[in-house]
Amino acid sequence: MREHKNFWDRNAGLYDCFMRKDRAVYEKIYELIRPIVKDKTVLELATGTGLIAKHIVKVTARIEATDASPEMIAEAKRGNCSAKLHFSVQDMFSLPYAGNSFDVVIVSNALHIVPQPEKSLREIKRVLKDDGVLIAPTFTHAENSLRGRIKAYFMRLAGFPLHSRWTSEEYLSFLRLRRGEHQNAIKTVPQRQGAGHRLLGCQRGKSA
C-alpha cells in the first residue's frame, strides 16, 4: 500500500490535467449519481482531487471525502468552497466512522487498483446504513482495446498500481459474491480508451 500511496502523492498535481480527456465520461457519472445522493449523507473513498465530490455536493446533505494520499487531499482542499464537503486523509481498510453512518458510499475507479478489494468492501459494508447504496464505478481492464492495453502497459511502467483486470461480468460477480445483495441502477458508461466503465448502485438489504 505504501507504493500505491506514493504513486498518487507523486502525481497529485497532474491528476486533474490527466482526467480532462475523460470529461464526457465523468459528466455522465455525475448525472447518474446526483439523483441517488440527493439529500443523503455520503462517504467517498479514493476521492483523489475531489472531482466527483465537488460536482455532486450541492444536492447532498453532506459529504466526507477521503483518500490515502495526503498530496491528493491537499489538492482537493484548494478548490473546496462548500461547507457541506469535508476532505481528510483516511485508510479505506480502517475507517474512523461508526457503523451504519452513511446513506451512500462512493468508491470510484479504485477497487481495481487496491491489493485487497474484498477487505475494502467489508469496511464499506460496516459504515453503510442497512438500506444504503454503494456506488462503485471502475475500469474493466480485461476489456481494453489494443490502444487501451498499450496505454495500461506504459502506465504500469510508470508505477500505476493495477491489481485487478476484471471483465464487466467478473466485476459484477465479485460484488455479488462479496456483498450478497441485488444491484439497482446498473449502468455501463463507455470509456475512451476502450475499457468498460461501470456504475453500480448496490442496495443493501436489512438481512445482509
Please provide the spans of the model-predicted regions.
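Conserved alpha-helix/loop element of class I SAM-dependent methyltransferases that forms part
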Residues: 21-40
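Short catalytic micro-motifs in class I SAM-dependent methyltransferases
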Residues: 109-110
